Every structure is written in C-alpha cells, then in structure tokens.
Amino acid sequence: MGSRRAAGRGWGLGGRAGAGGDSEDDGPVWTPGPASRSYLLSVRPEASLSSNRLSHPSSGRSTFCSIIAQLTEETQPLFETTLKSRAVSEDSDVRFTCIVTGYPEPEVTWYKDDIELDRYCGLPKYEITHQGNRHTLQLYRCQEEDAAIYQASARNTKGIVSCSGVLEVGTMTEYKIHQRWFAKLKRKAAAKMREIEQSWKHGKEASGEADTLLRKISPDRFQRKRRLSGVEEAVLSTPVREMEEGSSAAWQEGETESAQHPGLGLINSFAPGEAPTNGEPAPENGEDEERGLLTYICEVMELGPQNSPPKESGAKKKRKDEESKPGEQKLELEKAEGSQCSSENVVPSTDKPNSSRREKSTDTQPAQTQPRGRVARGPGIESTRKTASVLGIQDKVQDVPAPAPAPVPAPALAPAPVPVPAPTPVPSRSSEQVYFSLKDMFMETTRAGRSQEEEKPPPPSTRVAGESPPGKTPVKSRLEKVPMVSSQPTSSMVPPPIKPLNRKRFAPPKSKVESTTTSLSSQTSESMAQSLGKALPSASTQVPTPPARRRHGTRDSPLQGQTSHKTPGEALESPATVAPTKSANSSSDTVSVDHDSSGNQGATEPMDTETQEDGRTLVDGRTGSRKKTHTDGKLQVDGRTQGDGAQDRAHASPRTQAGEKAPTDVVTQGSERPQSDRSSWKNLVTQRRVDMQVGQMQAGERWQQDPGDARIQEEEKETQSAAGSIPVAFETQSEQLSMASLSSLPGALKGSPSGCPRESQAIECFEKSTEAPCVQERSDLMLRSEEAAFRSHEDGLLGPPSGNRTYPTQLPPEGHSEHLGGQTHQRSEQEDSLSQCPKKEQPQEPLHVGLSGGHSTGLSQEVPAMPSLPGTGLTSSLQEELPGTAASLHTNTDVPLPSRDQDFPSSAPTLQLGPGSPTQSHPPEAMATSSEGACAKEPNVDGRSSGTRSCDPGLIDSLKNYLLLLLKLSSPETSEARAESQEVADTGGLTSSSTLVPTMEVAGLSPRTSRRILERVENNHLVQSAQTLLLSPCTSRRLTGLLDREVQAGQQALAAAQCSRGPCPTPLTIPAIVVGEEGSAGEDSEERTSQESDKKGLLGEVEGHTVESRTQEPCQEEAMPGEALTGLPAATPEELALGARRKRFLPKVRAGSDGEANKAEERESPTVSPRGPRKGLTPGSPGTPGRERRSPTQARKASMLEVPGAEEEPATGDLVSRSKDSGLDSEPAVDEGKQEALAKQRKAKDLLKAPQVIRKIRVEQFPDSSGSLKLWCQFFNIVSDSVLTWAKDQHPVGEVNRSAGDEGPAALAIVQASPTDCGVYRCTIQNEHGSASTDFCLSPEVLSGFISREEGEVGEEIEMTPMVFAKGLADSGCWGDKLFGRLVSEELRGGGHGLQKASRAKVIYGLEPIFESGRTCIIKVSSLLVFGPSSETSLLGRNYDVTIQGCKIQNMSREYCKIFAAEARAASGFGEVPEIIPLYLIYRPANNIPYATLEEDLGKPLQTYCSRQWGCAGAPAAASSSEALQKCQTFQHWLYQWTNGSFLVTDLTGADWKMTDVQIATKLRGYQGLKESCFPALLDQFASSHQCNTYCDMLGLKPLKGPEAAHPQAKAKGSKSPSAGRKGSQLSPQPQKKGLPSPQGSRKSAPSSRATLQASQAATVQLLGQPPVQDGSSKAQSMR
C-alpha cells in the first residue's frame, strides 16, 4: 500500500488515485448510498494503510460503533400479540394489551384515532403501562366519546410497526366509528393538498438555502458536489473546474453508471479514470488534505441526516449517465494519451475517484451484501493506490467493466448479495461506510495477514500497491486491480444475476481479450451462476437485471468496447487474473463470468475476487466449498480464488507480467482506441449477435441441454472458436502470454497437487491467449445469447467456428492448441501429438485430451481418443458430458454447476484443454468432480457447492485406478477403440460429438470398449469398484449411482443393439465408426447422442438435454459433412460380429424416405425419436416410446407422473400416425416407409426448433401475507407461436398462448396455498415443432416451508361491485355502483377440484344493503392462475379476467334461471324452483391477487346437483331422488332447448333451493362474452345422456335423444323459446350444413344434427349476443 500510496500523497490519491485507474471499478466497490457518498471512502489515517482495505475516513469512534452494532443483531419491532377489538356497554372498563418484541427494545406509543395518548397523564380516563414486553392501555368507565380506533405503535432504530383495535361503546358501532374516522381523513387530505400547493411555491427557496449552507461549508467542494435530493444527499455536482473536467467527467461517468445501476451494485462501475473517492475529487497534486477532507466530510455528514437518502432519482441518474458518457470519452482520450500516467495523472484519476466513490456508494450496497470490508477494501484501496498510469489504463478498462458487471449479474455472488438487492438504498452513507470500513478493517486484517502469510507478497491490495509503484507495474497492479474490481462488481452485480434469464443475452459484450477469458470463466461461472441462479433467483430478489443488463449491454457495449479496447494485454491479464479468481470461487466464477461478460470487470475482478471470496466466504456461508477454498484456497493455490491463492497471484503476477509486456502495449493501444472504435465494436457485436441469433435457432436445441451447459459449452466454444479465429498475431501474442503463463504456471502446476490451480491458471492462460483474439468474438458471443454461445461452443467442438475449424483428424496448429490450452505450448504440443496420435493411448494424455476435448477442436479431437482410453473411462464419460454436453457438469446441473465452478479449477483442465499433462493427472478428479461432484461436495440445491472445491488427490488416484481397471477390461479393444475414437473424430466431428454425445459408452470409453466392459463386467463389479474408491460418502454414492445407471443404460443399449443388429439401422452399442455414409455416421452419432442423452437423463440432466445433444451432433455432422468418411480403420472381427459395418450400411431402412430428408433427419432422428435409443426401433423394445419425446431425466423421474401415451412417441408406425394427427404429416397416401421417412424428416427439421426447458419449475412465495405461492419455469427456443399449458395431477388447469420469441418465465399462481393444492404440477409448451415440459411435486413438506396466510385483526378494505343485467340477456351485463367496506376473512374452505378457494368472511361494515354488518359471506377466488411476464398475461390481468368470467357465468345463469322460474311457476304443480344466487365482484387492494367474488353464505353444507364428469364437485352429490336435483336437471334441459343447444349449465351445487358454483358450456367461443367456456362436447354429452323426468314433462320439454333433437323440440316449443321464430334452420338442414361453417368442429354428431345445431346456434347468437372466447379459467372457478 505504501508504495502505491507514494504515487499520490493526497488522501484521495493515496487511497484511490494510485489504484484508481485499475481499481476504479474495484474502488467503487464500496458504493454506499447517495448520502454516504459524501464520505471519502478511501480516506483513512496513514496507519490504516496497512490493512490494505478501504477504511472509513473516521475510523475511530465510527469503527467502534459499527463493531458494536455488528455484535448485536438488531431486529425491528414485532407484535407477538395484537390488539383485539372490543365492544362494551357504557361505563365499562376496557383493556387493550399487546406483546412487542424487537431489539433495541421498542418504544410503544398509543393513539386514539390519530391523537397520541399521554403515557403519564391519562388518568382518570386511561392508564398506559407495560411490564416487560407486554404493553397495556386501560380505559375506565368508557363513554360513547371513547369509542374509537385505538392503535399501538412500536418503534426502534430498525423500524416501526403498529396494530389497532376498535372499541365500540353502546350505540357507537364500529361502522360509525369508521365513518367518523374516514371523515377525519378526508379533512386531513384536503388540508394536506393545500399545504402541498403552498409548499411548491416555497420549494425552490428552500433548496436554495440548502445549497447556500453547503457552500458556506466548502465552496470549492460544494461546487464539485452534486446534490441528489436536498442537503441530506450531498452528491458530487458536476465539477466546475476546467482542469477537473476530464477526471470529473470520468468519475461522473463512473458514478453515473453506478448510480444508474445502483441496484446492480456496480462496484466496478467507476469510469475508467474515476478513482472511487466518496464523490470528492481526489485532491490534485496529491494535496495532503486528509485531515481537512475528513473534517469536511464529518461536517457535511453532521449537517445531513444520518439516514441514507433515497437513491438518486431516475432523472438524476440519467443525467449522470449522460455526463458520464462524455466523461468516458474523455477518459478514453486521457487513457490513450496517458495510459501510462505517472502519479501526476493521479489527479484525473482522483477526480475519477470521486465518481468511483459515488459508484462505490452505489456499489457499496451490493458490496455490503458481501462482506463490505472485503469488497470495499480490495477494490477501493487497491484501485486508489494503483499507479496513475495503471489508473489511466485501468480506468478505461474499468469504465467498460463497471457497466458490464451490472449487466452481468454474478449469479454466484448474487447469493451472497441476495439480501441486498441492488435497489435497496444503503441504510445511511455514514453507517454504511462505517460498516464497510469495519468489515474492511477486519477482513483486511484477516485477509492481509492471511494473504501475507500465504503469499509472502503483500495482501491483495498491499501486493497490488507493493507489486509496483503506480508507474512501475501499471499492468500488474491494473490486472490485480481489475480482478478486484471484477469481484466487486460481481458482488454488486450479484443482485442482477438473480434474474435467471439468458445472461448472455443481456450480458454486455466483453472486452476482446477479457471476453475470451471471460467467456471461459463466465461459462463456468455462468453455468454456476445458472445453477446458483436457479436457487438464487428465489434467494436473491429477482432484480429486473436483464433490462438493466440490456441497458448496460448497450451502454456497456461501448464501455466494453473500451474494455476490449482496453488492450488485449490488459484484458488478457485481467481475464487471466479473473480466470483464476473465477476458478477460485464459484461465486467468483460466476461473478467473473458476469464480469467476463463485461470483460474488463472480469479482468478487474480477480483481486477483488479474493477479497470478495473472503467476503463471500464470510457472507456466503452458502458455499462451504468456497469457504474452504477461500480458507484453504489461499494455501491451496487453488487458483480458483486469486485473492485466496497467493500462489495464484504469484503465478498470476508472472503470468500477468509475461502477458503484461505485450498486453501493456496492447493496453496502450486499446486506450488509444477512440470511442468510435467502441461503436464499431458495438456494431460488430450487434452483427455477431444477429449471426449468433440465426445460429441460435439451430443451436437452440443443443442449447437446450442446460442453459448452464449451453453457456459453458458456448463459452468454451467461443473460446475455441475465438482461438480458432484468432489471428496469427494474436495467436503469437497469446502464445507469448501462454508462454509467460507457462513460466508462471509451472510452479503453480507443481504447487497444486490437485492441479486445480494449475487448471485455473491454465484456464487463465488459455483465456488470455484466446482472449486477445477472441475478445471481440467473445463479447459478441456473450452478447448473442446463451443459445448462440452454446451453438458456437458446438461449433468449437466441431472446429473453431472462426474457420480455423480443424477436423477431428487434424489438430489445430500447435500455436492454436497453445492458445486453447493457454497453459503451455508444451502441453498444447502434447495435446496436439495426442490428438494427432489418438491411437497411442497414454491414459493420462488421453485423459488430458479428454479434458481439453470439450474446449478446443484439437482437444475435442483428443477427446475422441479419450473415449477409447481406459484411463479416460469414467472421466471420459464425465468429460464427454462436461465438454460435449457440459452435461456432466450440467447433467447434475444442480451439483455440476457448482461442482463446475469447483471443477473449473479442478476440471479447469477440462476446459483448459491446454493443460494436458497436469490435467491428465487430475482430469479424472476434475471430471469426477464435475459430473459426480467427487472433488467438490455436493452443491446445494441452489447450485452452490456446499463443500470444498479442492479435489482430493486420493480421489483422483482412485478414479485413475478405476479407469485403469476399465482399461484392462477393455484392453484387447483399446487399440481398436483408439482407432475408433480417431475414426470417430474423423467422422464428422463425431469425436466432439462423442464428447457431447457419447454413445452407450461406459465412462466415455469407446462404444466397443464399453460394450465389452458391459458384456464382461457385471453391474455390481463396476459399482463395487466405485464403492471401493476413497471418496466421500456423498461422492461415493453419487459415483456408484452414476456407474450403476450407466451400466444399466449400457446394457439396455446393448440389448437393443443386439436386437436391432440385423433389421435395425445401427444399434447404439456399436462403435461410432462410419463405414458407409454420412448418414450412417449421423445415425451412429445419433445413437450415441440418444445414449448419451439417456445417460444424461440418468445423471439427472436437464430435460431437453437429450434433444439438445442430439441436435448438436447432427449439426456437427452437417457442419463437417466430409469428415465422417475420414480414415476409418478396417472393421475388426469384433466390429463385424457386432454388426457395426452392417449397421453403417443399413441406412437403406431410412432410404425409403426422400433422399434429401434422410441425411439431416437421420442424423438428428435416426428412426423414431431423436431421444429414444435405436432400441426404440426394435420391435421388441418396450418402454422406449415413453422416453422418446421427453428429456431422459424427465422420462425417468416423471414417468410415474406422465399420462401414459400422452407424450409417448409410439414407435415407428405410431410415429407416422402421430405426426399425421399433429398435422406434421399431410400425405396420408404415402406408403408406410415414406410416411416414416417424412415423419422423420419433419422431426429432424423440427428438432432444432422445438422448445426447450431452460428452468425447471420452482416455487416461490408472494411477498404479501396472503399465503399464495408462485410456481414458475422457463422455456427457450420458442421459434413459433406456442400454447403453454399447466396441469395439476394430469388435469389441465389453464393455458395461455405464447408468441414466437416470447421466452419469459411461465408462472402459475396458487392462491392461498393449502394442503389441497399439493400434487404434481406440469407445465408444457407445445408448438408445431415439438413440445417441452417440466414437472414439480408440491408436497406438504414443500408447503410447510412457506409462511401460512396471515389475517389482519381488523380485516381488509374492499370494494364490492354488483353485476346488473339492465337490458336482459341481450346485454352481457354491466356493473352497478361500488360499495366500500371492510371484511374479516375466516377459515378457508375447500374448493371444487382444487380449482377454487373459498373462505368465509364476516362483514364489518360498508356493504349495506346487500350485506348487513356482522353477516357472513363467502369469498371465492380462482385458486390456480396461469400468468406470464407480458402485460396481456400478467397475474393481475388474469386474476381480473377469470374473476369477471366467473361473475358473468353465474350471474348470466341466474338470469336464465329467473326466466326458467317464471315459466315453471306457470306450470301448475311445479312447486319450488331452484334459484342461483348472485356473485359480486370484490377488489382487495392489499392483496397481490386482488380480485375475487363475494356471495352469501348458504349456511349449510353444499350438495352437488349437476356436475360435468371431468370435475366432480367438492360437495357430495345429492340423492338422485331429490326434488331439487331433478329440477336442476330440468333446468338444464330447458336451458339447452331454449338456447337451441348453444348454452348449458353444467355444474350446480347448493343448499336447499339456492344454487352456486355454476359452470357452463357453450357451443360457440365467445358466446355472450364468455371467453373460456366453449365446451361443445359437453353439450353433446348432455344431449345424449339426459333422461327426462316428470318436471321436464310438466314444462312440455321434448326428450333429447341426441343433439339433433334440440331443434325439433325447440320448434315444438316455439311459444316458449327464442327459437320459435327461426324457421330457416329447420327448413333445409342440408344446405345449411354445407354453407355454414361448423362452429363445433370437435363435435362428432351426425351431419344432420350438426347442421341443425349450427343453424340454431347462429340464431341464438343473433338473439343472445356476441360470440365469446373460451378460457380454461372457468374450470378454475369450481365450487367451493
């Protein structure tokens, strides 16, 4: 710190300027609320410098206070018991009591209406006492004037709560009391309005005074400050001084950014030049104003309120943003001019610091979420101390990254920050700072000590400072700073990650170099983030980060462009740093990823990451592994946590240094790049995004695997593609970098037995090397979308998308490999040689290859070799899944993702490709970790890893042994397998495919080897060997299960293959050797794919993964059509025996279909279902059909839930008919073979377009106290209009249309969740291209985890609106006058079929004359509401529509019933007539689901009189002999006839003669405005099943012998029914039948009857109103 500090002596400079450039992003880490911005974050006494953390300016008393505050957990007041309303007669005594808890002890104030009661002088009327936490108000001899609303208000430093009770005395009822109260409120409101109007006039004057006050304090500073909202929020104003303009602009920019995204917590948001100095420009020339500034700050703070002011207004933020943009430009120029600024440049950075400080305040909130100390201290201090030159450069970088971080929420970090959604304003600047400083101090000390101990080098910040004087090591410090910044942004960004949407889509482009690195780490982190995100989303508030991100993306794009401009070197360095950091922390990774997206931030992040990691570790108890890594990691050289690993740093330093040389130049260049560059880069990115989007459609399905997988793969791909596309120059540079990193790596590699550090380093190097060239690509990729990324990843697997695409047979140039590997040329070379000579099987090398395979083409090639390698065995499969499908990681998405982060370090090799040797030894471990989580403890459901990430060498050895065992088993075939794998590689990228989609291989061995093992080894043998490994119980179990399932799957495949050997196209088990055609190769790959997908399914891969992998493989094959035929070895006797050749040549089976379709189609869907293994084709393979259409995981997990045949894809024959039904096959005449072919073709075409599940169903609780839950999930790749359907226990509960491209979350609200709502919920999306679904079991255990409904003591205010049919039935109803009143809800009652919630409520007042006070009534609300993100499908809108429909249905039926009653009374002897009670619409403003219906309480248990078959009413059925039941059936008959079969009441329940819970069916959609009640089948069913009774005869109703009877009956009954005047329909049914469009297409009645019905329908429509639309909600409206 000292050396850094030397750069700028001023406190501002010392703390901020030196590091400012680099750490500006970091610096902002602290970012308290606007109020606290007035503090200079970095200011602290000289002594505090040693802490290496930003300490509070006034660290003395405030620090002590903050420590004490932290020691005691403060809680806001809480009423354990609330006031109970009382009603007494006059002269009675009354006591109100309540029990309040909270710390500090709350102070309770009593109010009568709005008048405070004196706690001491109340006698003789009242007395206020309290004993402990029980507070009492005693009233004596109450009179009517004492009747009022009494309120107890409890407050402490944490908040204020209140409760109230009503005292009724004598005739002064509650109603009157409330009326009196409302009158008072109205008077108050009127007076308030007058005051406001007057205050507007004085407002300007007041603000002027405030300004004057501040100006008096410090005219200079004041002018530089901007005030956010009044004096309280002293914020820097636009700098006045010209010389400060550049720097101030920079800081403003940074500030603006941070302010703009305060919620994002862009700790790194500072503009490149800004050094976060609490908003004060750092004194120029290093003025030594520490003392003065501190004093000034204190004064300002004293003047201003202690509470943190509200966040800056949007307008101000916008203003700041705008200002910051120019600032950025200036900063860029400054950077270009003086990227190597000397300490003199510190001044600008100092100004920047101001902005940083502001950003800091903004960021601080997120940062606070993380351990403040860490975040603040690392970035702030380091950034402050970074050299000016570093500052200049880094400022630029930071500028870019800062914005990016926000857009790229760090999912991993997000968990920690979760509590602090970016939006939440910091409690108070001062307090925040204090806390921050406190934490910083503690964390700094701990960390500093730790880092020092571990690192010998100074603590992260210290080291940064010490590493080089500002001028000396600008790059290194910058890098380090960048990492710090990144981590900070990560934390700040964390909140955004909450949103689990495609991060990449929203992620801003990364800087070129960084983007590459970022993409790698971001892949990992992103997948992590996703896994975390899944949990996080609920944990962390879902911040609408995506939009913000988007904003950033646009805006950040330039910044990021800057970042990319940053300089390949810098970017590379930062990425490198970031990469380790990422590896180090899953959260860091996540963050890094996000940052990576931002690119620069990712780079900045590493340093902070350490800090963050510590913070995370502290804050994030969640990731135990992270903690361990953090604690151990530093020692471990985990490499994952840059901050953690001094080693990492040491390596990073060399790496950085090595990279710095070129990078520095690059950086300078980057800084020199004009903004225009950025725009062009932006355009580039945009173009790329477009391209990617196009590709996304294709890649979408692959994407489908797992968003995380896709991401990882995508990023890997990107990395690969980037590497592939990297220009030679970049390559050279990257090589240099990699060399540098190699030099630094060696120690690290050696240092870390687990190889994790090595891997992470390798990743870094790899990222670096790839990054420089790939940065743009990366950013673009990032921008594109996860899907695009995924696709690119696949491409990468196939070959670098860039066009360096290397066929599996040919490795990329060594340099390229090096790039990819980034770790060492040697390793790359080894890899190259390995890949080149896959036949040579060196278990380790193959492993290495396998690991790297996923990442680079060369690697993927190697991977193919891997499959054959026994050593690769388990690891291989894991690897295959990891690289290929990223499945292993994603497969166990929940586990793998975290494990992935963990793996990243440990499985980094996998990603790294480059680090062959180190990886080789550790690959199995890494692999195991990734797929099995062997190395890492099982991640929590959140996806966070709960265990240590570090891999156990023992585990690795055990895995190796196991793999060797497998090798021995398959040794005879090893060479063959190798050859095969090589061939496979040759075959159209099958190698990569195999990685992506292994055939039925055991642990990734070649199919042949796997087959042999399966044949020779018994299930328990494998399982036992797995069990004998020295693994943790968890891992062991998981591994064993994996092997077990794998073996089972393999055996199944084997059996299927054997069965299909002859007639079927290739069985899955046969090695993926393409003997004849691409098609066959495609088939094989497909088989492989399906098998892999099965395997994945077994592993718990995400639904749709199978499809994805399959899709990927076909794509790959298509991509490299010629490769399939390359160098196939001669068929071995075994192969021939297995029928491999035969298989390959069997494409004729598909040949029946059009030749063209066969290719793609066969590849994608060999025969039947893309998913189902070939075994599905074999006649004797039962059960495959069910699996074929859904993801393997789902098939296995939810097979029990699945409606048999509902989604099954029957077999070949069925397929055709199925496709016919769905309209896919429009040529019924085609012979069966052709039909199959056509079906296959279409399916093959659609595979890429079929929707995919991106997020499975998860449950959340609504924020209000209503007890309602939300189930939500998300689909992507929705390329055409789709229908989204929710079902509970296989009963559809609602559906909603989704337009193409609408990939927002799909949600189902469960209103007032209760045990009756438990069941299996499924969400299915379907369109012409396919369908995807996801299930969730809502069990009582899950339900018990949520807070049950809370009912306020005094109920809730409501608005009630009656429905009026002023014009009779011709009118669809209108609404009467509203009544305002209050209800108290009581117990919940059951709903019919769980589709409706009914609760009894007591009317307090306001609903007369309909409901008298004290009367009970029933509130009903649809219990299941399907909604979505769009305004048309919003929860409120759906709730309103469904409720309105319910009102209309019942009230319209009531009108019909009135007519029926009139006719019935005319019939002598008919007797009493059923009556349908009215429904009233109520609006409850305090409820998230505000609309409901209100009806009278019938006071008796309900009986069912009519019910449609599908949903039996909740009430017991009335006796069939019941008069009421018979009359209800007569009413149905009469109504059916009276409306000519257009309208029918299908459900009635009631007590005695009063009916409710009405459901209807209409023949026409939209009949009478009833949108969702079109069920023509129910009308037909009624007509055929109704049996007339005596009451039907009394009314002269004709028997219904079928639908056709309706018309004649109507005719006969002309006098009584509207059909009387309609002659046309009866006259000539035939012509009508032809001429009229049949509204009831679904009806299956005879033509004549249909014609008549149509005619009568038309007439009815004319008579009764406009046609409606149908909505599943009517169903949801069942009886209570």
From Swiss-Prot:
PANTHER family: ALPHA-PROTEIN KINASE 2-RELATED (PTHR47091), ALPHA-PROTEIN KINASE 3 (PTHR47091:SF1). Disulfide bonds join 1273-1323. This is Alpha-protein kinase 3. The modification Phosphoserine is found at residues 229, 1199. Residues 9-21 have a biased composition (Gly residues). It comes from Mus musculus. It is an enzyme of class 2 (transferase). It catalyses: L-seryl-[protein] + ATP = O-phospho-L-seryl-[protein] + ADP + H(+); L-threonyl-[protein] + ATP = O-phospho-L-threonyl-[protein] + ADP + H(+). GO terms for molecular function: ATP binding; protein serine kinase activity; protein serine/threonine kinase activity. Keywords: Developmental protein, Disulfide bond, Immunoglobulin domain, Kinase, Nucleus, Phosphoprotein, Repeat, Serine/threonine-protein kinase, Transferase. Residues 77-173, 1251-1339 form the Ig-like domain. Disruption phenotype: Mice are viable and were born at the expected Mendelian ratio. They however develop spontaneous cardiomyopathy with features of both hypertrophic and dilated forms of cardiomyopathy. Cardiac hypertrophy is characterized by increased thickness of both left and right ventricular walls and by significantly increased heart weight. Some features are also associated with dilated cardiomyopathy. Cardiomyocytes show an altered architecture, characterized by reduced numbers of abnormal intercalated disks. Involved in cardiomyocyte differentiation. InterPro entries: a-kinase_dom (IPR004166), Ig-like_dom (IPR007110), Ig-like_dom_sf (IPR036179), Ig-like_fold (IPR013783), Ig_I-set (IPR013098), Ig_sub (IPR003599), Ig_sub2 (IPR003598), Kinase-like_dom_sf (IPR011009). It is found in: Nucleus. Expressed in the heart and skeletal muscle of adult mice.
